[in-house]
A protein has these predicted regions:
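Flexible, glycine/proline-enriched loop segments at strand-loop-helix junctions
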Residues: 85-92, 138-150, 181-185
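Short HxH-centered metal-ligating active-site micro-motif
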Residues: 61-117, 163-166
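Class I SAM-dependent methyltransferase SAM-binding "motif I" and its flanking Rossmann-like core
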Residues: 117-152
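Active-site glycine-rich loop that binds ribose-phosphate moieties when present
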Residues: 94-98, 144-168
Length: 240
């Protein structure tokens, strides 16, 4: 599978400090049999094709059919082992993103997951779920805060199935409380349209932003300060 488009998308969004608050984020591309997902420990801004991890979609699908123990420690240990067993990459030292299973659940070719300051100003805010529906509509799926790993994937699996029954289509935009945004589509161009649409709607709710031009000296410091002050401004300036 050609990963050049995935690499370009990853580098583009990963290079914008307004989209990757505190680093992090991940991306993927898939066909009917194989998922390529960002490797753990890599950076979106600089990731190369060889740093994505190849995984079997059939094995990932089997995880959703597995009956794991109720005990958190035992469940997550077995779940992690099954995720690693789904890795088909020739380089067995690679570890997939912790959200690989969630990427596999989306019924679209490309998936983008980032932590934009504007989005996190919403998802980390007071009354966020209600505000999300008010500003973005019901077709943006909201997921309440929960444990990462299998628990998150299971909840998303159930919510995504319920969404399809209600709307007659698959989820393309998903918000995680206190976390970030997932956007899925069959083309990178459509991901851009969906992502920009969310950002545009949130920008209209911002009453003011901070001026940090005199408070920083280096480029690195300025990027960090802009990310932080934008988040603080958005947390207090959105109509909560």
């Amino acid at each position: 599978m050609d990963l050049s488009t995935l690499v370009k998308m990853s580098n583009t969004y990963g290079s914008n400090p307004a989209y990757v608050l505190a680093g992090g984020g991940n991306t993927s591309v898939k066909d009917d049999t194989t998922l390529y997902v960002k490797g753990s420990g890599t950076q979106l801004a600089t990731i190369k094709s060889e740093e994505f991890v190849e995984m079997s979609r059939a094995r990932l699908n089997e995880i959703m059919k597995t009956d794991y123990p109720e005990d958190d420690v035992k469940r997550e240990s077995l779940y992690l082992a099954d995720v690693m067993a789904a890795v088909t990459d020739a380089d067995k030292t690679k570890r997939p993103s912790v959200e690989a299973l969630l990427h596999n659940l989306f019924a679209y070719t490309y998936v983008l997951h980032v932590h934009p300051t504007l989005v996190n100003g919403l998802t980390c805010g007071k009354g966020a779920k209600e505000l999300s529906e008010q500003l973005l509509g019901k077709e943006v799926l909201w997921i309440d805060i929960c444990k990462p790993g299998y628990t998150l994937a299971r909840i998303c699996y159930e919510k995504m199935n319920a969404y399809k029954e209600e709307f007659g289509k698959d989820v393309q935009v998903l918000l995680l409380q206190n976390h970030g945004i997932f956007v899925a589509a069959n083309t990178v161009e459509e991901i851009g349209v969906l992502f920009d649409g969310v950002i545009s709607k949130l920008e209209k709710q911002v009453k003011r932003t901070a001026d940090v031009s005199d408070a920083v000296t280096s480029e690195k410091e300025q990027a960090a300060a802009v990310s932080y002050t934008h988040l603080r401004a958005h947390e207090t300036s959105l109509h909560l």
